[in-house]
C-alpha cells in the first residue's frame, strides 16, 4: 500500500494554555509548518496556533 498523503497534526496554542485543535494537512503540498489564527476558549481570544506532532 502507498503512504497516505494526508496526515493528522495538532495545532497548539501559543498562549500557553495547553488548548489544541486536531486537523489534517496534505504533506505533499504543504511541506512547511502550519500556523493559523483561531479562537482559544481558555484565553477567551483569538491567538496563533502552531503545528506540532501528535504523540
From Swiss-Prot:
Gene Ontology cellular-component annotations: cytosolic large ribosomal subunit
Keyword Ribonucleoprotein included in the entry's annotation: yes
Biological process, per Gene Ontology: translation
Record keywords, A-Z: Ribonucleoprotein, Ribosomal protein
InterPro entries recorded: Ribosomal_bL33 (IPR001705), Ribosomal_bL33_CS (IPR018264), Ribosomal_bL33_sf (IPR038584), Ribosomal_zn-bd (IPR011332)
Signal peptide: none
Any one GO molecular function term: structural constituent of ribosome
Keyword Thylakoid in record: no
Pfam families cross-referenced by the UniProt entry: Ribosomal_L33
Domain of life the protein comes from: Bacteria
Family affiliation: Belongs to the bacterial ribosomal protein bL33 family.
The name this protein goes by in its record: Large ribosomal subunit protein bL33
Name of the coding gene: rpmG
Amino acid at each position: 500500500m502507498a503512504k497516505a498523503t494526508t496526515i493528522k497534526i495538532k495545532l497548539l496554542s501559543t498562549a500557553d494554555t495547553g488548548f489544541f485543535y486536531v486537523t489534517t494537512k496534505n504533506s505533499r503540498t504543504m511541506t512547511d509548518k502550519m500556523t493559523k489564527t483561531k479562537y482559544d476558549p481558555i484565553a477567551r481570544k483569538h491567538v496563533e496556533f502552531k503545528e506540532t506532532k501528535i504523540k
